[in-house]
């Protein structure tokens, strides 16, 4: 059967495998591509190709990530798998590979392990909306009661981290047996069941263009006789000529009207998510708006200075700091287009943070920035990236 081209008409969903080392994340990733390739819904990617994932740079941080793609009858999936535990942490915190849903892989022979917990917690902190669980290596456990026990324990663990433990789908199987016998109905059944569950349980993401308008301001010009133009890339939503926009962050929020949208020196009726535009703003002076602010649909985003965040601090070998930092550390936080100084408060019982650690912190900025939970940032010292983070909660 000839391999058909992927249908780009299907809804696109980003997923990824998470879980403890050696529980079978990469084997499962390979098995999905192998089993689906029997129906032309994927091209098979070998375990070793996934395992020696290429390195990518995201926000100044090097991360090894493997990408595969496949499709079901209903959807097109992009799937990420990381070779090392540190890569997972970096990936989830930087959002290098945004996940609309996760496949948590747990070996039935071991049950929940430290990295299982850490990945579930991180998924919660960085806002992964849903996950399904693949109980792997079930062929190596003779006692069904033992498998049930592992499942019960995991459902409780999911509850602890505010995932709906009772509702999360669990699929029992063996990724290795499916990988080796993709045509065998019994052995490959767990993969087809997994596909059905991610299709039905992981919600379809809201497309950027359907979300409320937001554009980080990158530059500001005044055009004599016409007014002030703010330029930037529309992050989400649509801005139409004549609509009201708010200028948010750094100083008091101001409302104005967008009287024109241009792109590549042409006038348009609207700017959409992904477009690099100039927005002409009525009655706004050149000095009233600056880089670091955002244009947004009024009432959809507010400026804040205090937040909780999950951070990864670069190791020395990654070009990060050579020494630990302590409570009261004052780096710059790079949000969207600009650096803002902030003060870091470490959690109780943590004296210092070593290069290469990940840590949950509280931070207070010296100027307010438009933000909501899920916003990512780089941590910098004098223009050099020393870490990355994602806001888990707004405090004030």
Swiss-Prot record:
Keywords: Cytoplasm, Elongation factor, GTP-binding, Hydrolase, Magnesium, Metal-binding, Nucleotide-binding, Protein biosynthesis
All copies of domain tr-type G, residue ranges: 10-206
The EC number(s) this enzyme carries: 3.6.5.3
Region G1: start-end pairs: 19-26
Region annotation (G2) ranges: 60-64
Cross-referenced SUPFAM superfamilies: EF-Tu/eEF-1alpha/eIF2-gamma C-terminal domain, P-loop containing nucleoside triphosphate hydrolases, Translation proteins
Binding, GTP: 19-26, 81-85, 136-139
Region of interest: G4: 136-139
GO MF: GTP binding; GTPase activity; translation elongation factor activity
Location of the region described as G3 in the Swiss-Prot/TrEMBL record: 81-84
Any Pfam family matching the protein: GTP_EFTU_D2
Catalytic reaction equation(s): GTP + H2O = GDP + phosphate + H(+)
CC terms in the record's Gene Ontology section: cytosol
Homology family: Belongs to the TRAFAC class translation factor GTPase superfamily. Classic translation factor GTPase family. EF-Tu/EF-1A subfamily.
Name of the molecule in the record: Elongation factor Tu 1
């Amino acid at each position: 059967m000839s391999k058909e081209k992927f249908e780009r008409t299907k809804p696109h969903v980003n997923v990824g495998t998470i879980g403890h080392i050696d529980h079978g994340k990469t084997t499962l990733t390979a098995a999905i591509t192998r089993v689906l390739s029997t129906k032309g819904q994927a091209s098979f990617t070998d375990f070793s190709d996934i395992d020696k994932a290429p390195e990518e740079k995201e926000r100044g941080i090097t991360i090894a990530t493997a990408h595969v793609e496949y499709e079901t009858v209903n959807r097109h999936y992009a799937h990420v798998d990381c070779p090392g535990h540190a890569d997972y942490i970096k990936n989830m915190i930087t959002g290098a590979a945004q996940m609309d849903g996760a496949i948590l892989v747990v070996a039935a022979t071991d049950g929940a392990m430290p990295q299982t917990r850490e990945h579930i917690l991180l998924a919660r902190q960085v806002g992964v909306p849903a996950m399904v669980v693949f109980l792997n290596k079930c062929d190596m456990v003779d006692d069904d009661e033992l498998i049930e026990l592992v499942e019960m324990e995991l459902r409780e663990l999911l509850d602890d981290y505010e995932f709906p433990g009772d509702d999360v789908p669990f699929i029992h199987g063996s990724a290795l047996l499916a990988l080796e016998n993709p045509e065998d109905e019994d052995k490959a059944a767990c993969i087809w069941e997994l596909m059905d569950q991610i299709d039905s349980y992981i919600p379809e993401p809201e497309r950027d263009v359907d979300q409320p308008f937001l554009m980080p301001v990158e530059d500001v010009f005044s055009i004599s006789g016409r007014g002030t133009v703010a330029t930037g890339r529309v992050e989400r939503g649509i801005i139409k000529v004549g609509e009201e926009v708010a200028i948010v962050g750094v100083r008091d929020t101001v409302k104005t009207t967008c009287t024109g949208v241009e792109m590549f020196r042409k006038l348009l009726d609207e700017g959409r998510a992904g477009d690099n535009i100039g927005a002409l703003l009525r009655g706004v002076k050149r000095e009233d708006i600056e880089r670091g602010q955002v244009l947004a649909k009024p009432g959809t985003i507010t400026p804040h200075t205090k937040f909780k965040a999950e951070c990864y601090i670069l190791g020395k070998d990654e070009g990060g700091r050579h020494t630990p930092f302590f409570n009261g550390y004052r780096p710059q936080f790079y949000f969207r287009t600009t650096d803002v100084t902030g003060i870091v408060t470490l959690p109780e019982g943590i004296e210092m943070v070593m290069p290469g650690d990940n840590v949950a912190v509280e931070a207070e900025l010296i100027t307010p920035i438009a933000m909501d939970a899920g916003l990512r940032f780089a941590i910098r010292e004098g223009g050099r990236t020393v870490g990355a983070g994602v806001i888990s909660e707004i405090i004030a």
